[in-house]
From Swiss-Prot:
GO terms (BP aspect): translational elongation
CDD domains: GST_C_EF1Bgamma_like
A single GO cellular-component term on record: cytoplasm
InterPro entries xrefs: EF-GSTs, Glutathione-S-Trfase_C-like, Glutathione-S-Trfase_C_sf, Glutathione_S-Trfase_N, GST_C, Thioredoxin-like_sf
Any Pfam family matching the protein: GST_C
Cystine pairs: none
Residue span(s) of domain GST C-terminal: 94-225
Protein's UniProt name: Putative elongation factor 1 gamma homolog
Gene3D superfamilies: 1.20.1050.10, Glutaredoxin
Domain of life of the native organism: Eukaryota
Length: 225
């Protein structure tokens, strides 16, 4: 019996928060079905009225789960690979490491990604360009990036120096939106630690099927005015 169904944007694959859970299902060889909401529209709309994803439905549709970080955590615990669980979430009982992982997950999945989107949306015409708001968002992105750059000058990954954790995966997924749009060659030359870290993390086995054809932007996209 399947352990459940992960609803994700299989057809367009544009949503940042769906990257990590898809990669976890594939890399951990989980008995979880990947489905696009359009393939089970009645179930999806009934169980998830906000119509956001990723979302998860357990066996026999008896329970549901929303919010990317919660889904990532649950999927990891479905794995029989105890070493992978320890690597991604930190050792059991090591609350300092686990809290640090959660700290970076939360920062990247909320404040950072929200500000990156505030820059990205005017670049593709999803949101009207407002010079004041755009400038403020860029400054907020720069402030948060400086925290990553500072940490990554000291170690290879955000929490554990010798391996990636879930914090790195969620953070790299969020950074990918910047790297395809406005983290251009000039920006990357000014942020060498973040750039090296990102290139290392997207090669992680836990991102199976996600970044094989990824290309960074050469020049910064300009807002549509």
């Amino acid at each position: 019996m399947s352990d459940g169904t992960l609803f994700t944007d299989l057809k367009e694959r544009k949503l940042i928060r769906t990257i990590v859970p898809r990669g976890l299902v594939r890399s951990l060889k989980l008995d979880v079905k990947l489905a696009d909401p359009s393939d089970a529209q009645q179930l999806y709309e009934r169980e998830f009225p906000l119509r956001k994803y990723p979302t998860f439905v357990g066996p026999h549709d008896e329970w549901t789960l929303t919010e990317a970080m919660a889904i990532d955590y649950y999927l990891i615990h479905l794995s029989s690979d105890k070493e992978a669980v320890r690597q991604l979430l930190g050792p059991e009982g090591d609350f300092k490491t686990r809290a640090d992982i959660l700290r970076w997950e939360s920062l990247s999945n909320s404040d950072f990604l929200n500000e990156v989107c505030e820059v990205f949306f005017p670049l593709i015409g999803v949101k009207p360009y407002n010079a004041t708001e755009f400038k403020a968002a860029r400054e907020n992105v720069d402030t948060i990036v400086s925290l990553y750059e500072k940490r990554l000058k000291k170690q290879q990954y955000l929490v554990c120096d010798d391996h990636e954790t879930l914090a790195d995966l969620i953070s790299a997924a969020a950074f990918s939106l910047g790297f395809i749009s406005f983290f251009d060659e000039t920006w990357r030359s000014k942020h060498p630690e973040v750039t090296r870290w990102f290139n290392r993390v997207i090669k992680s086995r836990f991102f199976e099927g996600e970044f094989e054809s990824f290309k960074m932007c050469e020049t910064e996209m300009q807002p549509i005015k």
